Amino acid sequence: SSGAPKRTSEGKDGFGATTGMGICHSYTPDGRCVSLLKILLTNFCVYDCQYCVNRRTSNVPRARFSVDEVVKLTTDFYFRNYIDGLFLSSGIIQSADYTMEQLVAIARELREVHNFRGYIHLKTIPDADPALIAAAGRYADRLSVNIELPTEAAVERLAPEKKVHTIKLAMGSIRRKLDEKAEEPRSPKFAPAGQSTQMIGGADASDDQTILSTAETLYGSYKPKRV
């Protein structure tokens, strides 16, 4: 990737910004930079994680896209060469299964109805039915499950409605599916770009050593492409 600083036209007249609201840049294993429409299906959420701006008790404006709206945004931007793909996440609405069903429906419609061949990254909801996670992998290039924080104690304190055990079960399920695909190349497609995860630094007192140790454990246990 280029060592040049990222340009922004925020607050200025002009064009050519390399950063901007809604479009992020990611790098493929071969070094290519790809532009992704990075959006939430909704910022409504039933969870009240203390570190999240969209937590249940946060006084922020709320919005929600429909499945058709996300599909249209993605295809319109793609055909105009604004993006190379979609990075889709969501707050939790109604239930984990309901929300995951909506994410899968978007990916399914893009692939099967619109023959979309761009990149799709879906955030996976750990509490969702494993069958929904498996379905997500059939349509997405990459899946990701957030580990949230560097330690289980921090998750229990700052996001008590989430369970590290459940998060790790979801990551383990994805790893097994990826291993099965590697052993049987002719089996149905499953997240060919693998899985990734992320955690928030600075929300608790974890030092660099703790963060690096957690990342090392995750790489060893679940083989994510990126932490």
Explain the meaning of each model-derived region.
Residues 1-44:
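Flexible, acidic/Gly-rich N-terminal and inter-domain linker regions that tether
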Residues 36, 49, 88, 145, ...:
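Conserved, mostly hydrophobic/aromatic
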Residues 39-68:
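Canonical Radical SAM [4Fe-4S] cluster-binding loop centered on the CxxxCxxC motif
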Residues 47-51, 82-83, 148:
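Residues forming anionic-ligand binding surfaces in small-molecule and nucleic-acid pockets
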Residues 52, 85-88, 143-145, 227:
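Hydrophobic residues within beta-strands of alpha/beta enzymes
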Residues 54-60, 86-96, 120, 155:
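Short acidic, glycine/Ser/Thr-rich loop/turn "cap" segments at secondary-structure junctions
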Residues 71, 94-227:
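Conserved AdoMet/S-adenosylmethionine-binding subsite of the radical SAM
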Residues 73-89:
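Short Fe-S-cluster ligation motifs
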